[in-house]
Design a protein with these regions (language model features):
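Noncatalytic, beta-rich nucleic-acid-contacting surfaces in large DNA/RNA-processing enzymes
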Residues: 3-6, 10-175
């Protein structure tokens, strides 16, 4: 702090500002530095909290879907986010080979969340993209069809999809 004061006083003197005026400028700058930085950040943070709370209250499904699509965030796990959404009345549907896309989406007019392929551990966005792309040509009619049309899909990927329940609706296969 002493060195910063000396630099500030020296800079002021180079501009013709000396004595009590230079001291007063330094004192005010230091006071603002101790207050202004945290104050501005707390205002920004308060605004984000307010906006987030408003969205979560009025659009809980959209709020949760957006947080799921922003993973990894480092604050809450996807499981925690889904559990909280359900506790607030949001219906959350699992991954479905026939309808899911890469990320979480809204269904039924925005009141329901459909989990995306990125919620399947170990699947990866490239493989998820391939699944969606192949499904646009035609629906998968079996696991063999999925394996044939999506190069690079492994037994581990199939097991992860099965564990997530992705084959239940589309192929009639349960976990």
């Amino acid at each position: 702090a002493r060195r910063q004061r000396q630099m500030c006083i020296r800079d002021r003197s180079e501009r013709g500002i000396t004595g009590d005026v230079a001291d007063e400028i330094y004192t005010k700058m230091r006071a603002f530095a101790n207050y202004g930085f945290p104050e501005s950040h707390s205002v920004s943070f308060a605004y984000l909290v307010y906006a987030s709370a408003w969205i979560k209250y009025h659009e809980p499904a959209a709020f949760c879907a957006a947080l799921l699509n922003a993973q990894p965030m480092g604050f809450w796990s996807p499981h925690t986010l889904v559990r909280d959404a359900r506790r607030h009345g949001v219906t959350v549907r699992g991954v479905d080979l026939g309808v899911s896309v890469q990320g979480a989406t809204l269904e039924d007019g925005g009141s329901v969340i459909r989990l995306g392929f990125t919620s399947v551990r170990g699947l990866g966005s490239d493989l998820a993209e391939q699944i969606v792309e192949q499904r646009q040509h035609s629906m998968f009619d079996s696991l063999e069809d999925l394996v044939r049309r999506v190069p690079g899909i492994t037994v581990a990927h199939l097991e992860a999809l099965a564990t997530a329940g992705a084959f239940e609706e589309c192929l009639g296969l349960n976990r």
